From Swiss-Prot:
This is 2-isopropylmalate synthase. The lineage of its organism: Bacteria, Bacillati, Cyanobacteriota, Cyanophyceae, Synechococcales. NCBIfam families: leuA_bact, PRK00915.1-3. It is an enzyme of class 2 (transferase). SUPFAM superfamilies: 2-isopropylmalate synthase LeuA, allosteric (dimerisation) domain, Aldolase. It catalyses: 3-methyl-2-oxobutanoate + acetyl-CoA + H2O = (2S)-2-isopropylmalate + CoA + H(+). Its EC number is 2.3.3.13. It comes from Parasynechococcus marenigrum (strain WH8102). Keywords: Amino-acid biosynthesis, Branched-chain amino acid biosynthesis, Cytoplasm, Leucine biosynthesis, Manganese, Metal-binding, Transferase. PROSITE patterns: AIPM_HOMOCIT_SYNTH_1, AIPM_HOMOCIT_SYNTH_2, PYR_CT. Pathway: Amino-acid biosynthesis; L-leucine biosynthesis; L-leucine from 3-methyl-2-oxobutanoate: step 1/4.
Length: 540
């Protein structure tokens, strides 16, 4: 059997695989804010990014290693393809962290070998030990992944894993890269690795899975029963295509059904010892932070963290819950960080009260950012009687989200009505240049604003999504706007909130436009799609 740490290790890849969700690109400050909250959540490993992809990715991983990694904190990990250039960059990026890891990988399925790598099985068996050995020469904690293991020949997989462990890999990760397997198949795959890889006892066995068939969490739980002890997952299940296995669902499944899973860890069925180190009361806070910063809305019926996860509409259910919550609820909402207590701030609240509440919500702002957030808070408090946590999150997430600002919005004015053509006048400045003003007509006020902004910026794009939702209840609620722009097949999200939804739309559009421009100037590599040319004897 694989090495057993006595519990499940939670490997969070929100900042790497999760960020590959279309439109979910994050800037450095956003990544740092999420990493700090992941540390508070208690994850064991943070995969902070793919350092070789771009200078921005390298800087983000290095900054997280410096500020989040610690002697008692999470392991900071970076991803690297099986090439010395990637591995060296990864080692340099994570080096500031006392607890650090290189995660290197290569595909093992025949379809990937033939069509992506154009390599033979023999080539891969030559590359793996050399690259793992090189990584091990740089640090002691090395994870090796067999990309597309779910569609790989098990016999070949056993050979590759044995070679990787012999070369120094301390964690072996088995990805279901395209979400193809069923729970019984995935469980059998993990059981086979435990049974037929002779040196598997020298490494922790990990799993990584996508949700293309909606089976990622079920696959992982079956893998746990068969000896997997590290789960690679993301907050809210975000990720490419249908997403990754959801961290909050996995953690709570193990928490709620601990008596069922305990025997698979060699424990007494009634053992009260948690199966993971995650602080479950931080789950809702973490989910909201990731949703706010990525602009990816959590579906209302999402398990554990959805808005309706603890809501009851049926009269029979409501009656039962009022008499005893256990009649229809298997989880106490407080366990995941939900509380009936609402702490509301108002126009008389001071800077220290706002700072303290933001820290409780997971935001650690610099003095300058706090000054700006407090100014926005006071402005909102003049227009809105009661400021709730969701209002604060909307204010600060928009601020943290600001990318490198090529364009800055200076003015928005609109006129519209039943007998008027919707017309917008906007003023825009470009990198400290003079303001430029233009007016445009549209089918509605938001369309007019976007047309005017496009005229001024002159950056080709296609607006493919506009959504607005109320942050809180009441007629004075802030409107939270998400805009997604597309260019050359890539999506760029903008997110803003204001009591005036037209102003919020303009701010969100500029936010997305700045992301688009920044991305076009610094195109990162994709760890799976951008396959390096691998020789049997790669060199720097």
């Amino acid at each position: 059997m694989a090495k057993d740490p006595g519990r499940v290790l939670i490997f969070d890849t929100t900042l790497r695989d999760g960020e590959q969700s279309p439109g979910a690109s994050l800037n450095l400050e956003e990544k740092l804010a999420i990493a700090q909250q992941l540390a508070r959540l208690g994850v064991d490993v943070i995969e902070a990014g793919f350092p070789f992809a771009s200078a921005g990715d390298f800087a983000a991983v290095q900054r997280i290693a410096q500020q989040v990694g610690g002697e008692n904190g999470p392991i900071i990990c970076g991803l690297a393809r099986a090439s010395q250039r990637d591995i060296k960059a990864c080692a340099e990026a994570v080096s500031p962290a006392p607890r650090r890891r290189i995660h290197t990988f290569i595909a093992t399925s025949d379809i990937h070998l033939e069509h992506k790598l154009r390599k033979s099985r023999a080539d891969v068996l030559g590359i793996v030990p050399e690259m793992v050995s090189y990584a091990r020469s740089l640090m002691d904690d090395i994870e090796f992944s067999c990309e597309d293991a779910g569609r790989s020949d098990p016999e070949f997989l056993y050979e590759v894993i044995e070679a990787a462990i012999a070369a120094g890999a301390t964690t072996i990760n088995i990805p279901d890269t395209v979400g193809y397997t069923t729970p019984s198949e995935f469980g059998d795959l993990i059981a086979g690795i435990n049974r037929y890889v002779p040196n598997i006892g020298e490494a922790v066995l990990s799993v990584h899975g996508h949700n293309d068939l909606g089976l990622a969490v079920a696959n992982f739980l079956e893998a746990v029963k068969n000896g997997a002890r590290q789960l690679e997952c993301t907050i809210n299940g975000i990720g490419e295509r249908a997403g990754n296995a959801s961290l909050e669902e996995l953690v709570m499944a193990l928490h709620v059904r601990r008596r069922y899973f305990n025997p698979f860890f060699g424990r007494d069925q009634d053992s009260p010892t948690p199966l993971s180190a995650v602080r479950t009361e931080e789950l809702t806070k973490t989910s909201r932070l990731v949703s706010n910063l990525t602009g990816m809305v959590v579906q209302p019926n999402k398990a554990i963290v959805g808005a309706n996860a603890f809501a009851h509409e049926s009269g029979i259910h409501q009656d039962g819950v009022l008499k005893n919550r256990l009649t229809y609820e298997i989880i106490d909402a407080k366990t995941v960080g939900l509380s009936d207590n609402r702490i509301s701030l108002g126009k008389l609240s001071g800077r220290s009260a706002v700072r303290a509440r933001l820290e409780e919500l997971g935001y650690d702002l610099t003095r300058e950012d706090l000054d700006e957030a407090f100014a926005r808070f006071k402005d909102l408090a003049d227009r809105k009687r009661e400021i709730t946590d969701r209002d604060l999150e909307a204010i600060v997430s928009e601020q943290v989200q600001q990318p490198e600002a090529r364009y800055q919005l200076q003015l928005v004015q609109v006129s519209c009505g039943t007998r008027l053509k919707p017309t917008a006048t906007v003023a825009l400045s470009e990198e400290n240049g003079p303001d430029q003003t233009v007016s445009a007509v549209g089918t509605g006020p938001v369309d007019a604003v976007c047309r005017a902004l496009n005229q001024l910026a002159g950056v080709p794009n296609e607006l493919i999504e506009f959504s607005v939702k109320s942050v809180t209840e009441g007629i004075d609620a802030m409107g939270e706007v998400t805009i997604r722009l597309r260019r050359d097949g890539s999506l760029y999200s903008g997110h803003a909130a204001d009591t005036d939804v037209v102003v919020a739309a303009a701010m969100a559009f500029i936010n997305a436009l700045n992301r688009l421009v920044a991305a076009q100037e610094h195109q990162p590599l994709h760890p799976q799609r951008d396959a390096v040319v691998l020789d049997a004897r790669p060199t720097l």
